[in-house]
């Protein structure tokens, strides 16, 4: 590093939106201390790799990213979920500068300071009030808690990130307000278990504006809806009180729920240690759609869980036909070091997992195509993510970034990223919509 030249850091962020928020917090602190971000590893003084350790495939991706950083730079700091169990990382890469687990912001900063001292003292005015974001300017993830109190047998998140720790309501709302003032049009509310928000702090009230707001899922959602941006609720565990948020939907609280049901067969759900009354869940879904006809449901499922029989898998397919989930992600079960599900009997062979994954996704493709076809001829509000010469790419209220479908928008007038426009839907395929800006 040349004398008087700001030190440069290259940053790789892997994993889920919660991990992305952790990366944003680290980058915000580093920028406050005068560090600059480099676009390439070989143009940086050091590299930070924020890892994912949830699945073996994610671990391999993390190890690959570390290897790439070592090859192109050689001075590498590793953090994130995989860093909570550093043995495999140390075995492959013994010459790393530091390895830390998730949420260990101070340890990461200490490692940076040791390897690359800041050029000058922090000047907070280097930063925008909302901090540094890795998402596009028009949307941002808003993390309301850390950790999880559930003990799903397939999951090691509580071991990596600990039990639930909720942020005070006023703290969340202040961050959200800063984001909206900075131009964010969509807030994506995330955590490991969004609907458990506030349980650990006994729903403690805090002062916000001229009133008190309790740290409850529904109360927080209501207040976020007053800020003027779209509010999208993700990672919602299906607790009974989730029913209370449905009547809030239709304005800025988007008619969208991301609920990871994981399966539909009662016995499989018991082995997963998940809520098992899926007949009641179907009744709740029907009630939600009666209250909010425009509701979009996204969910994730696991096929090939240990002991899953053909009959149990068929229950999942039948349930899906009844539930008519709008957006679906599916994972083939894979053992994760430290997960209690590893001890379950009757593992499902890989070829059967693949066959079931294909069958589930084919079933969902038909459901998705049918549900999207109903939107042809309607008008939808669309937020623009990308612009081209004649067609822009955006998302309706039914689409979360990165994981859901898109709306392809033809327009005679120029559109900008972040614009929210009314689009007349003219065509649908299995996952996406196509239309043109209304009024032209």
Swiss-Prot record:
GO biological processes: tRNA modification
Reactions that this protein is recorded to catalyse: L-aspartate(89)-[ribosomal protein uS12]-hydrogen + (sulfur carrier)-SH + AH2 + 2 S-adenosyl-L-methionine = 3-methylsulfanyl-L-aspartate(89)-[ribosomal protein uS12]-hydrogen + (sulfur carrier)-H + 5'-deoxyadenosine + L-methionine + A + S-adenosyl-L-homocysteine + 2 H(+)
Domain of life from the UniProt record: Bacteria
Alphabetical list of InterPro entries matching this protein: Elp3/MiaA/NifB-like_rSAM, Methylthiotransferase, Methylthiotransferase_CS, Methylthiotransferase_N, Methylthiotransferase_N_sf, NA-bd_OB-fold, Ribosomal_uS12_MeSTrfase_RimO, rSAM
Co-factor note (free text): Binds 2 [4Fe-4S] clusters. One cluster is coordinated with 3 cysteines and an exchangeable S-adenosyl-L-methionine.
Domain Radical SAM core: residue ranges: 134-370
Main localization, broad class: cytoplasm
Cofactor: [4Fe-4S] cluster
SMART domains with a match to the protein in the record: Elp3 (SM00729)
Domain TRAM as annotated: residue spans: 373-439
GO MF annotation list: 4 iron, 4 sulfur cluster binding; aspartic acid methylthiotransferase activity; metal ion binding; protein methylthiotransferase activity
Positions of transmembrane segments: none
Cellular compartment(s): Cytoplasm
Pfam families: Radical_SAM (PF04055), TRAM_2 (PF18693), UPF0004 (PF00919)
Occurrences of domain MTTase N-terminal (ranges): 7-117
Cited function: Catalyzes the methylthiolation of an aspartic acid residue of ribosomal protein uS12.
Family, per entry: Belongs to the methylthiotransferase family. RimO subfamily.
Protein's name according to its UniProt entry: Ribosomal protein uS12 methylthiotransferase RimO
């Amino acid at each position: 590093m040349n004398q008087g030249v700001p030190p440069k850091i290259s940053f790789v962020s892997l994993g889920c939106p919660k991990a992305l928020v952790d990366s944003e917090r680290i980058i915000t602190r580093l920028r406050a201390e005068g560090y600059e971000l480099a676009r390439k590893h070989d143009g940086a003084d050091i590299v930070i790799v924020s890892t994912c350790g949830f699945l073996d495939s994610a671990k391999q991706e993390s190890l690959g990213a570390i290897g790439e950083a070592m090859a192109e730079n050689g001075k590498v700091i590793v953090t994130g979920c995989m860093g909570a169990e550093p043995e495999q990382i140390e075995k492959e890469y013994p010459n790393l500068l530091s390895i830390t687990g998730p949420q260990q912001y101070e340890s990461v900063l200490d490692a940076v300071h040791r390897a690359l001292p800041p050029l000058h003292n922090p000047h907070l005015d280097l930063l925008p009030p909302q901090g540094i974001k890795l998402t596009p300017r028009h949307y941002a993830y808003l993390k309301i808690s850390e950790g999880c109190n559930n003990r799903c047998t397939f999951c090691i998140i509580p071991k990596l990130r600990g039990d639930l720790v909720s942020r005070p309501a006023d703290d969340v709302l202040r961050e959200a307000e800063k984001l909206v003032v900075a131009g964010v049009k969509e807030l994506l509310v995330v955590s490991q278990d969004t609907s458990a928000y506030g349980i650990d702090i006994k729903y403690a009230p805090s002062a916000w504006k001229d009133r008190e707001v309790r740290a409850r899922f529904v109360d927080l959602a209501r207040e976020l809806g007053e800020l003027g941006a779209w509010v999208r609720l993700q990672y919602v565990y299906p607790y009974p009180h989730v029913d209370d948020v449905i009547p809030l939907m239709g304005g800025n609280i988007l008619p969208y729920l991301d609920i990871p049901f994981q399966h539909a067969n009662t016995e499989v759900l018991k082995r997963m240690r998940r809520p098992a009354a899926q007949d009641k869940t179907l009744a709740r879904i029907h009630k939600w759609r009666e209250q909010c006809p425009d509701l979009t449901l996204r969910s994730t499922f696991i096929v090939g869980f240990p002991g899953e029989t053909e009959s149990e898998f068929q229950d999942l397919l039948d349930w899906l036909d009844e539930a008519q989930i709008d957006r679906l992600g599916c994972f083939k079960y894979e053992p994760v070091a430290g997960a209690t599900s590893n001890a379950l009997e009757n593992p499902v062979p890989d070829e059967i997992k693949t066959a079931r994954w294909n069958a589930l996704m084919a079933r969902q493709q038909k459901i998705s195509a049918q549900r999207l076809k109903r939107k042809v001829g309607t008008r939808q509000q669309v937020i623009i993510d990308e612009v081209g010469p004649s067609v822009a790419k955006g998302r309706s209220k039914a689409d979360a970034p990165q994981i859901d479908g898109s709306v392809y928008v033809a327009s005679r007038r120029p559109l900008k990223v972040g614009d929210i426009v009314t689009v007349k839907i003219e065509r649908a395929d299995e996952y996406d919509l196509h239309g043109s800006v209304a009024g032209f």
